Regions:
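Non-catalytic interaction-recognition regions
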Residues: 1-309
């Protein structure tokens, strides 16, 4: 669309007509959504992630007209060059904050519009104390506009907290956004598959196990590699996803931690076989600085877990 203005115009028109409920467009859109959501749920299930609600922009499409009319009637929104906007600049601003566009000149809604309508919907249904948005850190200006507009137009209560948590991007070894070997955008399903394949290769290479058993183990260890590799980096910073490093059984990796847990369980298992029980165990004083350091680190575990939560 950057090079073909006619195509861009047709796309904008189609978007507007879809938002207005054109039947053929809506039917096609619903089919695409059903296929996409089913695939998303499958991928999230593979990551042991569940959501209580599955909602999209279209769920608030019907309340946008009511919201826009209220903003106009209460004097918050006005037309400028055909677009409906709300000024959100503040005296304390050190840089220019553009106005919040509610409706484009052709009447079409934007991400800003649906985000505001979603806030309105959540306030009416759930009355939350706080709403936390997690998105690419490059969306910071967008959410600054949305939050300011929501407060100015009284979509939220004065004491309702609106928070944005920006995260960095997962990049390849070249420092650019992570892609497939053929240069395409890396899909989550493909990423999970690649990691599982790499873990399977390493497990079969280093241990004599049956393929079926190795496949099951690869999925468990692969999940730890992906999750730990992502969470071990500061959320707001970009990082390089190196599949060789993340799937390694050495160093600060998910597979290494699982390997360590297995070793600990093995030691405890042998201890139990010899008649020992942890319940009757006695805490011994450390006999070296390394033991003391380990015990202090272990004692801090509960506090670290509470802080992370």
């Amino acid at each position: 669309s950057k090079e073909d203005e006619e195509y861009k115009e047709r796309a904008l028109t189609a978007t507007f007509e879809l938002q207005q409920g054109r039947r053929g467009y809506r039917a096609l859109w619903k089919h695409i959504m059903n296929v996409s959501v089913a695939d998303l749920k499958k991928n999230y299930t593979n990551l042991n992630v569940e959501f209580d609600l599955w909602k999209g922009e279209s769920d608030v499409q019907d309340i946008i007209p009511k919201m826009a009319d209220a903003m106009k009637e209460e004097g918050y929104a006005y037309y400028d060059q055909g677009a409906l906007i709300v000024d959100i600049k503040e005296e304390s601003d050190t840089k220019e904050i553009p106005p919040c566009i509610i409706l484009k000149s052709d009447g079409a809604a934007l991400y800003t519009t649906t985000d505001l309508a979603t806030i309105m919907d959540r306030m009416e249904k759930y009355h939350p104390d706080e709403m936390i948005y997690l998105a690419d850190k490059r969306q910071e200006l967008h959410f600054t506009q949305v939050f300011r507009c929501a407060r100015k137009t009284k979509l939220v209560n004065e004491d309702t907290r609106l928070s944005f948590i920006g995260f960095g991007t997962m990049n390849g070894k070249d420092g650019k956004p992570f892609k497939t070997r053929d240069g395409g955008v890396m899909r989550l399903e493909r990423l999970i598959s690649d990691i599982n394949e790499e873990m399977f290769r390493k497990i079969v290479e280093n241990r004599s196990v049956k393929d079926k058993e190795a496949e099951g183990t690869a999925k468990i260890v692969g999940l730890s590699a992906l999750k730990y590799g992502d969470l071990s980096n500061q959320a707001s910073k970009d990082y390089v996803f190196d599949i060789d490093r993340f799937t390694s059984f050495e160093g600060n990796t998910g597979p290494y931690i699982l390997y360590t847990i297995v070793r600990i369980k093995s030691i405890l298992g042998r201890y139990a076989q010899e008649g020992g029980t942890l319940e009757k165990g006695v805490m011994l004083a450390p006999v070296s600085e390394s033991e003391k350091s380990l015990m202090l680190s272990t004692a801090a575990f509960n506090g670290m877990m509470e802080g992370a939560f």
